[in-house]
Amino acid sequence: MATATEQWVLVEMVQALYEAPAYHLILEGILILWIIRLLFSKTYKLQERSDLTVKEKEELIEEWQPEPLVPLVPKDHPALNYNIVSGPPSHKIVVNGKECINFASFNFLGLLDNPRVKAAALASLKKYGVGTCGPRGFYGTFDVHLDLEDRLAKFMKTEEAIIYSYGFATIASAIPAYSKRGDIVFVDRAACFAIQKGLQASRSDIKLFKHNDMADLERLLKEQEIEDQKNPRKARVTRRFIVVEGLYMNTGTICPLPELVKLKYKYKARIFLEESLSFGVLGEHGRGVTEHYGINIDDIDLISANMENALASIGGFCCGRSFVIDHQRLSGQGYCFSASLPPLLAAAAIEALNIMEENPGIFAVLKEKCRQIHKALQGISGLKVVGEPLSPAFHLQLEESTGSREQDVRLLQEIVDQCMNRSIALTQARYLEKEEKCLPPPSIRVVVTVEQTEEELDRAASTIKEVAQAVLL
C-alpha cells in the first residue's frame, strides 16, 4: 500500500514538472547552480589582491589627516582664562590682585571665614590629620562622620542621614541607588546638572515636564496611569519618581511643593527633593522648602543637599527614613567607592550647624537682603531679573537675545568684567552646553550673603545698572 502511494506521488511530481512553465524551470535551475557555486567556491582569490606601489602608499600617507584627540577649544574659553583668587572667597574677595565685594560665591550665611568654624576644623586637623584615605566601608568611617550624620538627622527632623564626600556626587549617586532600568522618573526641565547625571546613570525612562508646571506634570502622570492599566503586570514592578529642586539652581525659582505632594499621593509616586540652594536658606530655622511651606517632612521620600553653600564646607548629605538611607550605604556609588569626607570638613560642618541653631534670626536677615537687591535690580534696561525675591542666588538675563548665544555670552561677560573693574565680583552661570538636557539662556548669576551691607547691596545694584546701560545701549 505504501509503495503504491509513493509511486502515485512520484507520478504527480513528474506531471507537475511537465506542466510547469519553461521560464519557471529555467529560473529554478539557475538558482540551484548558483547555490552549488556558493557552496564550493572560495570567498576570495589570492591572485586578485594587488599590492600598492610605493608612490601610492606615500600619497595615502600624505593625504591622511588624524582625528583630533579632543575637540577644538577656542582660545577665549573661560576654562583657559580663569580668574585667580587670593585668600578666602568670603565677604571680600581678591581676584587677580584686586579686592572686590563678593557676589559670586555661595557663602550664604557668611560662615566660610567664621573664626569658630575655622577653629573647629583646625582642632580636627590636629586630631585626625588631613584625610581618611579610604571609603566609609574600608576604615574610612571616623567618629566625627557619625556625629555629623546624627546632627543632620536631628536638625532636619528625620530618622537618619548619610554624608557624601562631594556635593555633586550626592544626588548623582542617590538617584541611581533607587531608580533602575524600567523605572519612570518625572523631572523638571530646569533640573541642575547633578540631577541630570544621576538620571543618566539610573538608565530609567525620563519624562520631562515644563518648569514648575503642575498641569503638565499631571498630564504626564495621567498618561502613565493609562499605560499602566494596559499592562498591570508590568505596572506592579515599575516604580515612579518625581525629582525636583527646592530652589532651582538654573532659575532661582522655588518649587510648588504642596501641589507636588498632592500629585504624589494621587498617582502613587515618590518625591526626591534636591535642596542644595534651599537648605540653610528657606524656613524659619533654615530647614529648607519643607519648613518654608509647612510640609510634613515624612511626605518627602528623600531629601538631599550639599554642604558647600550654607554650611561653607565640602560634601553633601541625604536624609529620610532609616530604611531609605541604609540602602544608600550599600548602593550609593559616591558613598561606597569614594574616600570619605576629611574629618576636618565634617567638624567644620558640625560647628556651622551649631551657629545656625544658635542664631535662627540669620535666615530672616538673609531673606531681607535678598528682597532688597532683587527690588533694586528691577527696571534695568536690557536686562531682566530671573528668580524669586527670597532666593539668594538668581540670574540676570538679556531681555532680548542677539540671536547668537556666543554674542550674548560676550555681552554679559563685558558687564561682568566692567563690574569687576569697579570692585563688584560677579560671574556668568556656566554650563556644559553639549551635555545639558535643556540648556538655559546665558545669564549673570548674582549671589547674596548675610555679610553684605545695605550700602554694598545698593552699590552693587547701581553699578550693574550703569554698566549694563553702557554695554547694551
Swiss-Prot record:
It is found in: Endoplasmic reticulum membrane. Belongs to the class-II pyridoxal-phosphate-dependent aminotransferase family. The chain crosses the membrane at residues 16-36. Signal peptide: none annotated. Its EC number is 2.3.1.50. Residues 1-66 are annotated as: Interaction with SPTLC2. The lineage of its organism: Eukaryota, Metazoa, Chordata, Craniata, Vertebrata. This is Serine palmitoyltransferase 1. Phosphorylation at Tyr-164 inhibits activity and promotes cell survival. The transmembrane domain is involved in the interaction with ORMDL3. Component of the serine palmitoyltransferase (SPT) complex, which is also composed of SPTLC2 or SPTLC3 and SPTSSA or SPTSSB. The heterodimer with SPTLC2 or SPTLC3 forms the catalytic core of the enzyme, while SPTSSA or SPTSSB subunits determine substrate specificity. SPT also interacts with ORMDL proteins, especially ORMDL3, which negatively regulate SPT activity in the presence of ceramides. Forms dimers of heterodimers with SPTLC2. Interacts with RTN4. It is an enzyme of class 2 (transferase). It is a single-pass membrane protein. It catalyses: L-serine + hexadecanoyl-CoA + H(+) = 3-oxosphinganine + CO2 + CoA; octadecanoyl-CoA + L-serine + H(+) = 3-oxoeicosasphinganine + CO2 + CoA; tetradecanoyl-CoA + L-serine + H(+) = 3-oxohexadecasphinganine + CO2 + CoA; dodecanoyl-CoA + L-serine + H(+) = 3-oxotetradecasphinganine + CO2 + CoA. It comes from the Eukaryota. Component of the serine palmitoyltransferase multisubunit enzyme (SPT) that catalyzes the initial and rate-limiting step in sphingolipid biosynthesis by condensing L-serine and activated acyl-CoA (most commonly palmitoyl-CoA) to form long-chain bases. The SPT complex is also composed of SPTLC2 or SPTLC3 and SPTSSA or SPTSSB. Within this complex, the heterodimer with SPTLC2 or SPTLC3 forms the catalytic core. The composition of the serine palmitoyltransferase (SPT) complex determines the substrate preference. One of its GO terms (cellular component) is serine palmitoyltransferase complex. Gene3D superfamilies: Aspartate Aminotransferase, domain 1 (3.90.1150.10), Type I PLP-dependent aspartate aminotransferase-like (Major domain) (3.40.640.10). One of its GO terms (biological process) is positive regulation of lipophagy.
